């Protein structure tokens, strides 16, 4: 806690990834409404390879100041190094802080697990096609053979058909391996059948459903008038597919509210279960015919895509310009002058004492990644050179005394050179 505000530490990777952002933003807003503040600790890679560079990146998590942090959340779906997750868990448990593991794919030594239940929503989807659209002839495109998620959804699909007395011909089953090219091969087989297509094609994920819609469109087969197509996941790409898919998705606004309530309970010292489950939601839409196609929605989607492409192009241009200017520059003062055009004025660049003198020996993830005292540079608007100051590395959060007063997500990100870590916050 700082100045009366409770503080949650969010441990993630690749915040530049839209899926990660979509998980963080609703929770952050929900916690703000409950008078919390958040610190985001992010790595630019998912740490899967666990290389020396990855370990340098992971040093960012050793900056967590547990004297001010009340609760820790670890997004294990994007942090893919078990050892690093266990290190965060150990540090938090040492300070008796509650830890939430968001969507864990394996068992860890502690923490409160937050999982998602897909089964009910997918069951409702298949029942919806039978009970509301009176489908009696189905095709199903699954993911990988042996994949647990795919096999569970396939089992649910078959169970619902059996419960409703709907026969299923195995010739209408195939593995699309969760992506486009294998799905195309399955669809070519379906389209070659002399009987013609069934009434509905149930896909185990949205990516395969989008591919199916594209192939049917190319053949002049209308969705949903001629064939119903459904997906599962609610991926970002689905927002730009027309017709919009009937699918199952996570309602992340509700999830943010659900999780923030659990965080408050854990922080209050309530006895918590080892695992909590949040359900997926059935979203009936255009590809089954429950919602009408809208040209207005198409126009909005096209404009959104253009804006995203334009923002991406501007970002690429800025990064290229910065790298071109910095590549062969060795004068520290000139480096600082260049950086001020590319770094926000509310950003600090922090590094170990002696960094510019090459004195980094021993400061790695396994030892002490940060010196007792660090140097920070802040790039104020209108100044050619940054303002420099020094402070103790163990008090980063307390140094930012304006943190609780501002409804801003304070982010700590590594700038890693080889296995040594600088920090941008």
Region spans (language model):
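GAF sensory domains
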Residues: 354-425
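Bacterial carbohydrate/catabolite-sensing allosteric modules
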Residues: 1-333, 340-345, 352
